[in-house]
Amino acid sequence: MLSDQSIFDVFSRRIHPFLPERVQPASYDLSLGDEFSVDGRSVLAGSQGFWLMPGMFALAHTVERIEMPATHAARLEGRSSWGRLGLMTHVTAGFIDPGFEGQVTLELFNAGPRPLRLTPGLNAPAIAQLSFFALDCECARPYGVERGSHYAGQSGATGSRLDELREVVSW
């Protein structure tokens, strides 16, 4: 796992925008973007933010665009202050592959008893954090190079590519 100093060294030119105050001892804090997807419908957060009701699931995205080198991977994790209110920032997709480039899609779920107001932007409380890992050597097939890299270069709240297969999802 990378320390704050290594995060500065490796990722200060690979996270856009990179804010030094977002670097933690072993992670980088991420900001919430303004686009949400609820049941496949795109919703922009208004001036009051986006309300995530109890039991509600929505896709969102980070403001930051990440460029992972072929020598590193990352884990997306929630922030404890949000977690204590019942917010999950990812359901199962918390891994960022070497070679990934794009905004990170968040899988938001409110497991708490109260509605949560989520405010997008760099001045709002961080929504999630990335911890980074150095690989033992550069990977031979970084994400985006081969077939199956469905989300390479994604921006915004990107939905599942599996829903294109009618036998997986029923609308």
Task: Identify the meaning behind each predicted range.
Residues M1-W171:
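DUTPase catalytic domain/fold
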